[in-house]
Amino acid sequence: MTTEKENVTTAVAVKDGGEKSKEVSDKGVKKRKNVTKALAVNDGGEKSKEVRYRGVRRRPWGRYAAEIRDPVKKKRVWLGSFNTGEEAARAYDSAAIRFRGSKATTNFPLIGYYGISSATPVNNNLSETVSDGNANLPLVGDDGNALASPVNNTLSETARDGTLPSDCHDMLSPGVAEAVAGFFLDLPEVIALKEELDRVCPDQFESIDMGLTIGPQTAVEEPETSSAVDCKLRMEPDLDLNASP
């Protein structure tokens, strides 16, 4: 009888212990779920505050990578890795202006945020998939700061004045001169066109000395054969057709 009571008591104790352990386990699961939910809410809040830029990806270790697609070669061009998303976005905007000119879609407005010098060079530290054809693009510093690109002083002065040199006016009609002067007023368009032409046609024509001369300096080679033809003048008879026979 005593043994049976002990077994019942042990069974009840085991049952109570199992329920208690299960209750403790359930509390632990709920606590972990609450912590996970709180972290998720916190991460969501941070993500909602972060601004996303075109052409910029955030690395898991915190840096920002920028890249752009070459519209001609249809390949991705690596622009570099930056400390902040804004620096990476500026690098993308500079590359977009290089590739598409004033029609580029940028992260920041072209007017007001970017001046004439906004057409900053593109880093030629390209991905291995890009051919060497893009190697002639100007550089961007390793720290992400764009190097200044020189602009033709004559072109800048002409664009600021909005006028053409006098010798050009002499050769053009008033209507054509006015239209050309209006073209030079839009300096970003001129720079974009020049850069596009330089990128598409990088080769330039240069004069080559072929060693040919015309005139008294032309050298005449004598024949090497000894059988030279001896040409003698033929004496024509002095005939007077008007004389009487």
Curated annotation (Swiss-Prot):
Organism: Arabidopsis thaliana
Name used for this protein in its record: Ethylene-responsive transcription factor 10
Taxonomic path: Eukaryota, Viridiplantae, Streptophyta, Embryophyta, Tracheophyta
CC per GO annotation: nucleus
Cysteine disulfide links: none
PROSITE patterns linked: AP2_ERF
Keyword Transcription regulation tagged: yes
Motif window: EAR-like (transcriptional repression): 239-245
A GO MF label: transcription cis-regulatory region binding
